[in-house]
């Protein structure tokens, strides 16, 4: 079908006159300059090495967005139990561990969690299609704004398609399906991906402050190849120097790709990522000494 000229012209004029809908902010200018949550049918990737805290940060961001903008999300985390995911949401929401919290507070936080999140209990193996079918069934009865799928490589392959397309084209097909699902339902789809083995061998040069330690992933380092970066709207890399004597508690977030800068956000400099300091017991993050969750506009423990 040929695109409608009037619709195209209207969208161009919207850009000209600043009427384009902006991605949602955290109200921290240094972060909002680079990262926005865009809900109007976007496919987003989070990439990074194993054991750097990708899942932890992503769940934290989803919890932050849920509270700040009253949003609802679905989480599919096949390498974590539903209990562990819910626990992280509760601890992030309370700003302290469950050991430090009363049963009354935990109960209130669980109610909040259940109202804003639906967690898919990964007790069976999913393909991309069976997962999307289940998510669509949830969408039909419980309206939500975004979904986290992680990790991508935990999804079983549809071998009929895999045999027809081959590995590289199969990934393109799956990513296209994710993208179309996001557009159809007007939601944000986030997919968490690992890096290739060779990326583990890449380290910072001798003159770098992290000399000899693993480098952050680039788009070409994603397991499955360039299809992922090519197909996604926005891409972030989550990295942490886990063996550094002092900076192990800092999570570095590189914004590698922003497809539509008109809606907010832009890539970070390769040597100036967004650095988030992990709070004690990993119950949240701080940026330049400011707690991202419990700032002046979000009171601690107010449910």
Q: Where would I find each of the regions flagged by the language model?
A:
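Hydrophobic/aromatic beta-strand patches that form the interior of the parallel beta-sheet core
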Residues: 44-46, 74-76, 118-120, 190, ...
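Conserved inter-motif catalytic segment of the P-loop NTP-binding fold
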Residues: 13, 69-165, 173
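Cofactor-binding loop segments of dinucleotide-utilizing enzymes, especially the Rossmann-like FAD-
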Residues: 78, 194, 240
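Structural recognition of the conserved hydrophobic beta-strand(s) that form the central parallel beta-sheet
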Residues: 75, 148-149, 186-194
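A short alpha/beta connector and helix-capping loop motif
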Residues: 162-178, 188-189, 243, 250, ...
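C-terminal regions of RecA-like/P-loop NTPase motor modules
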Residues: 1-11, 16, 129-132, 136-144, ...
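Flexible loop/turn segments at secondary-structure boundaries
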Residues: 52-54, 81-85, 127, 154-158, ...
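The Walker A/P-loop phosphate-binding site
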Residues: 1-95, 301-303
């Amino acid at each position: 079908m040929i695109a409608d000229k009037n619709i195209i012209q209207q969208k161009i004029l919207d850009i000209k006159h600043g009427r384009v809908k902006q991605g949602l902010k955290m109200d921290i200018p240094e972060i909002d300059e680079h990262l926005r949550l865009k809900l109007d049918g976007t496919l987003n990737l989070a990439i990074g090495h194993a054991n750097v805290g990708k899942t932890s940060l992503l769940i934290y961001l989803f919890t932050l967005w849920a509270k700040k903008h009253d949003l609802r999300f679905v989480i599919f985390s096949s390498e974590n139990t539903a209990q562990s995911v819910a626990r992280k949401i509760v601890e992030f929401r309370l700003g302290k561990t469950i050991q430090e919290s009363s049963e009354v507070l935990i109960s209130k936080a669980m109610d909040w969690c259940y109202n804003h999140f639906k967690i898919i209990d990964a007790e069976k193996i999913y393909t991309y299609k069976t997962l999307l079918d289940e998510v669509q069934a949830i969408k039909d009865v419980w309206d939500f704004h975004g979904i986290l799928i992680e990790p991508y490589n935990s999804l079983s392959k549809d071998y009929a398609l895999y045999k027809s397309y081959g590995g590289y084209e199969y990934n393109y097909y799956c990513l296209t399906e994710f993208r179309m699902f996001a557009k159809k339902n007007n939601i944000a789809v986030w997919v968490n991906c690992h890096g290739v083995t060779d990326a583990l061998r890449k380290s910072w040069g001798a003159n770098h402050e992290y000399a000899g330690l693993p480098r952050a992933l680039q788009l070409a380092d994603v397991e499955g190849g360039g299809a992922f970066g090519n197909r996604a709207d926005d891409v972030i890399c989550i990295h942490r120097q886990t063996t550094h004597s002092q900076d192990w508690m800092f999570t570095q977030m590189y914004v590698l790709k922003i497809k539509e800068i008109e809606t907010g956000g832009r890539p970070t400099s390769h040597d100036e990522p967004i650095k988030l300091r992990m709070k004690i017991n990993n119950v949240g993050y701080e940026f330049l000494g400011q707690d991202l969750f419990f700032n002046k506009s979000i009171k601690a423990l107010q449910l």
